[in-house]
Structure formats: C-alpha cells, structure tokens
Amino acid sequence: GKYLWNVYNDFDIFIADAKGKIKKQLTYTKGYDAEATVSPKGDKIVFTSMRSGDLELWTMNIDGSNPQQITYGLGYDGGAFFSPDGKQLVFRASRPKTDVDIEEYKSYLAKGLVAPTNMELYVCDVDGRNLKQITTLGKANWAPFFHPSGKKIIFSSNHHAEKGYDFQLFMIDVDGNNLQQITTESKFNAFPMFSPDGKKLVFSSNRNNNETRDT
C-alpha cells in the first residue's frame, strides 16, 4: 500500500508554558492548523493550514492575531522553520505537476490524507516573496532546518536510497548548491536541529533499536 499521512480537521494550535500547561488557543478555524514553529524573536508563528482550501503556509503573531497566507501553490506545504534572522522560511512541499498527480492529490486531500513520498525543499521571505525551490533530488526531502549562519540548510532525504525507508541527513547551501551527506548509519535519521553555535546536532534516529522501526 501507499504511505499516507492524516490531515486532521480538528487540529488547532495552542500556546503552553514550559511545564506543558496550556495558556491559550491560537487558532479556531475549521480544518487542519498544525506544524507550528516560533520565530527567533518569539513574535511570530509559521504554520500549515487548510483554511484556504489547500495545505498552505501561514504566519500569525504570537498571540494568534493577524494571520497572513504565505504560500499559494497547489500541494502540501509544511514543516516550516524561520531563518536565524527571522527574515526567511525554509519548508518542504509536495506539489503535484501532472494532471494524474493533481487528481490524486485532490482525491486524497478530500479524505483527509496526503501522500508525502515526493517532497522538495523551498525557501522564501517571511512574507512569501522570493520563493525558490532549492532541491530537485526526487523522492522525499523533508525536515529542513537552518544552520545558525543562515547560509546552509540541513534536512533528511531518501533520494540516494534504493529502498524508501533509508533516510540520511544532508546539508545544502541556501541557494541549492554544495549538497553534502552528513550521516551514513542506520535506516532512518531525521528532524535535525543545530545547537546555537552550529557545532552540534540533535536528531532522531533508529540506529540503536535492534532493527525495529522505533525511533
């Protein structure tokens, strides 16, 4: 069968304190509001929303006010993060091009599903301008995160793999040049994030799980 993700209609975004106590609900629109990350200054949130009828990126203030649509292309835009200076966004997108792929995407979305097997990485200004696709690798390229310098992006990809489950970490310049493989171990490495000084990485892996798929 095909690998599918659920897009839950009742997902909303909340603010909680450091102990997990919910302080405020930020979104109330019908449909999927999720995948939220906060800007470096702590004043803005970027998130994925279905409120326009498609899975697009939006921003809002930290208190939930002033929602602004950022992306407009048909397809699933998600997993966005701010650049260290808060001026750019990096995200992964699955954007169907052929009539067959477009029809399949719309059919799945109507059932609250997406098929995230073909995803590329994009960058844009925080207001959506200067949108640029920075990978054309094929397969699934996702979980992007800026290096603290703002000049490189680390991400997870299976573009190199014969089998789809072999995800490794790669780094690429923000303009799409100088692809470099970072990890080689195990079958799954994803969700990388840099330490503030850029010298260390934290990421998820299943390398020590006795050949199971627990991560």
Q: At which residue positions do the language-model features occur?
A:
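Sequence signature of WD/YWTD-type beta-propeller architectures
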Residues: 1-215
